Every structure is written in C-alpha cells, then in structure tokens.
Amino acid sequence: MISEVKQDAKSRMEKSLSVYLSDIDGIRTGRARTSVLNGIVVETYGGRVKLNTISSVSVSDNKTLMIKVWDSNNIGAIKTAIMNSNLGFGISCEATTIRLTVPDMTQDMRKNLVKLLGKISEDCRVSIRNIRRDIMDRLKVMQDSKEISEDDLRVAGVEIQKITDDIMKKVNDAFTSKEKELLHV
C-alpha cells in the first residue's frame, strides 16, 4: 500500500521534472539548437501541424539552423510560423531550404532569459512540493482510517522527503547548468 503511494509520488515528480527539462531546453542560448523549434506549430494542410512533421531541422553551424522542407508549398506557412514565434531569427530561403540565423544575444536578453528560467524553475519546485503535500495528505488519511500505523506514516514521510530532495536537486542542477549556459558570452 505504502510502496504504491511512494511509486506514485516518484512517478508524478519525475513527470514534473521531465516537463521542466523540456521547457528549459526550449530557452534559446545564443547558439543554434534544433530544440528551440520544437514548439513551432505551422498552419498547413487545413490544420495545425508541428514543424518537425513537415520538415527536417538540423544545425548548420554555431549560429545557423537549416530547415529542409519536404513540400515546397509549405515554405510560406513555415516562415510565417517562425516569424510569429518571436524567436528573433534572421530568415532566408533557397528552394526547399530555409536558413535561420541566430542573432547574438544582448546582456539584457540574457538577464531576461535568466529571470524566465528562474520563474520556470520555481514553478517546477512548487509543483513538486504540491505533489509531496498531496501524497502526505493521502498517507495521513490512510493513517486516520487505520490502514497504516503512525510509525509507518513517519517512515513513509521520510522516504517521500528523500524522493522530493532528489528531484529538487535535479531541478537545481539543471537550473545552474542552464544559467551558466545563458550567461556565457
């Protein structure tokens, strides 16, 4: 019974961590990275599709991304979607290839991105603490209904806290790493 609750806690916290890591991976750092375009949705074929389903994206060099469009009719829609994303890329087209030039980041841009990173990180921490509180509430209800003893509750609480601390350490490590990457000129 308690092991199921602990497994649920770990699973939910790891999902929060996974979402957090994908969110911060999308923050651009002044270097060309294909993950920056993961969230781009293109209006084409009478609907909305992700950019990577209608093209292939690769890194040409440190400052350039190359998008190979599979259907040349989609070039206009892709350019529009990229411009609307406000990523600040320079865009040039040649036949079925779109080149995106990553502009140099100013110190203000870097500071703003660090603030955004801090907000995303804190949201993740809050989410993890809420999961811990929810799990502890579930354990207390189990103790109140005599499904587990007070000692079991205390031991489970310590184990849940250890899981929480491990996940929080991963969040903090990812934050520190990304912050260094952002501030590196």
From Swiss-Prot:
This is Ribosome-recycling factor. The keyword Protein biosynthesis applies. NCBIfam families: frr. HAMAP family: RRF (MF_00040). PANTHER family: MITOCHONDRIAL RIBOSOME RECYCLING FACTOR PSEUDO 1, RIBOSOME RECYCLING FACTOR. Pfam families: RRF. Keywords: Cytoplasm, Protein biosynthesis. It comes from the Bacteria. The keyword Protein biosynthesis applies. The gene is frr. One of its GO terms (molecular function) is ribosomal large subunit binding. Its main location: cytoplasm. Responsible for the release of ribosomes from messenger RNA at the termination of protein biosynthesis. May increase the efficiency of translation by recycling ribosomes from one round of translation to another. It comes from Ehrlichia chaffeensis (strain ATCC CRL-10679 / Arkansas). GO terms for biological process: translational termination. It is found in: Cytoplasm. One of its GO terms (cellular component) is cytoplasm. Belongs to the RRF family. The lineage of its organism: Bacteria, Pseudomonadati, Pseudomonadota, Alphaproteobacteria, Rickettsiales.
